[in-house]
């Protein structure tokens, strides 16, 4: 019954399957999700579209957004900024659609400060051995890099206490179903619907 959409933040260690779970959620017909497109100062790659893959802006424009407190979260990688613009998220939420952010733990903590009423879900592997296996199967990292990723994963798992829910990604369909149940329940929380019922009784 809530008119305003809900902000859903999904994060977890590298290799846990955040992107795969996010894509499965968007393909499902459970709810009308909107995946928040990030903003970046890097140049578009062949085939990328502005407003679809990223919002491509200049460094000056991005830094102006930061100065105006217009970013939900941001970080700088290899001389380029990446982040989540607040205005697009707010516009979508006001339209009544849920917004899904798939971001790293550091970014999620920035979002938590600005949007404490969001739903923060931490995606976990069944165990660290399985996480290591998934990273190794990618075939993109050497052993030293994998070890660093595993150490970072342990640090990120320690941050789980800052989230509302922990969901094990053992199988993609199972993880998606668990997240959908969380979202369904969150939409029924009294603080999200109380205004609707007050209007019903004329208050």
UniProtKB/Swiss-Prot annotation:
One of its GO terms (molecular function) is guanylate kinase activity. ATP binds at residues 12-19. The keyword Metal-binding does not apply. Belongs to the guanylate kinase family. Keywords: ATP-binding, Cytoplasm, Kinase, Nucleotide-binding, Transferase. It is found in: Cytoplasm. Its EC number is 2.7.4.8. This is Guanylate kinase. Residues 5-184 form the Guanylate kinase-like domain. HAMAP family: Guanylate_kinase (MF_00328). It comes from the Bacteria. Essential for recycling GMP and indirectly, cGMP. Its main location: cytoplasm. The lineage of its organism: Bacteria, Bacillati, Bacillota, Bacilli, Lactobacillales. GO terms for cellular component: cytosol. The keyword Kinase applies. Disulfide bonds: none annotated. It catalyses: GMP + ATP = GDP + ADP.
